């Protein structure tokens, strides 16, 4: 079967995946329009023609034909000036003004997929993906827009991006989206992931009404409060039914994502670079590549959307060799010691961790320069020998002797005013001349638009990584960008944020290729830059600085809505919790963190009782037996109320099921709650050691389980079912 079918006589392009069809057409005028995106159809006859009507106040570019207006056509990639008053995909300014008349020129079809220069993007071999490029051309300005489509048939995803190419004349890009998509109706619920610091990835649902629903970031990062992702769902969509269109932007900086309705009750979805703080100067014979948008569709609801997303990201987006490797159980010393540690204290903590069965020890902030608080030394990546007299190499050797790997925290994009680096290179910090610097967490951001700054980060981080047996890096970023520096020419000032991101991607590309055996975890005060652009380089992310088990229920649910469980860092922490003060049972803290994905601990084990340490050892033993199922199995969200949460994972071979239920608060005379599991082999017999019973798969999926009636706050159970 051809993944991309071209009906040349009608100039129709039919892109097909396992689940959906995506159809575009060239009209007789040369305009490229969108005809269909939805459940897969085998053939497209074009029997249902586009209807042309005379619409008042919708101008026509064709003299004498009042029925033809771009304002009501489902355009594939729109521009300004010819009568489409909806939000455009591309705005340019040059000596001819601001109008573009983009007409179809030609197409190219090939197996495989090209890399996007300087940008993270999906990938696949010639058997997995087929690509189409369509050139649109404006004759007056000599500008060519190339729309790039890559069809992943088995994974059921479509990748889209655009390239803007100048010819004889320069121009300035004032807005350039990666993709827009027109729908023939507006009957949608918009799903997005919102939040704030320590409360990331809240799954929100908003009915689409008259006007525009828009999210984005101008922080220089995708941010805690927004994620570059939107899903449009039919009003009846649930976990197991309904239409869901998902769109991801593979980018980590300023972005916009919107869906708007029109007077004709159609809608337009768009994603790309945020335009208020963006412009880009193109010289003659110059080009600009947009970030990539990933599109999917299912008629089977949000569970199928999630599982498709997990599969695609794991197979076609995460570049790291760790993508299919089990993530180690780690302990991070941050909430155990903060900045107040010595080598002796670290080794005491490591010894207890080793006895418990922990596999990786991560040394967090405070190991370098004169870093005894958050007011100094960022940028001075040299070991503090007062704290670590045997250096990183000596510490790593001692950790390795205990049977654990050694990991290290960095914040390479930042600089402290009180640092040797700032005293030597104050011009490397992002700040506006003539104005006081804007501090956040007593630090400034390094200017990654400068090659010498990127080179310094690469060299200084590499030097540390080569100095000891380091197996893991936690790459943090604890503030957003404020000032735009004066260093760029006036006509390039608004290129800064995108140039910064290109610099960061260059650094990450170099370091992750240079150190392929190191597991890189991203962090930005938790989930402040947890997006697909960063995940391309770093297969694991610290989901949130909030480690409270109850708070983590919604954070991890929202994160796992689109990101694979193997990428989600989740830790057991101390009580009272350091963020919210809540006291939860160790069992619940463990159960919730295990369901997050990449499991670990972040507390002072040396202060725990023998009973607590025995319980932690048992948690670790349990997690060893279920790690593959949780990190690489299928996730199913189950019955949820305002006071309860439940989910189960099913291993790829359906031989194991891990079920977790959490009740937040005890209620008087509470009714019994029954939960039905999902995804099991219906004919198989499963044994559950926690219950001492056996169950058939269809029994668990249709009758379900009655939850224990326990009068305790923050109660949870974990049941493991193994196929007999």
Region locations from a protein language model:
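Glycine-rich, aromatic-flanked loop segments that form ligand/cofactor-binding clefts
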Residues: 71-74, 79-110, 116, 242-253, ...
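Short Pro-Gly-centered flexible turn/kink motifs
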Residues: 101-104, 280-299, 715-721
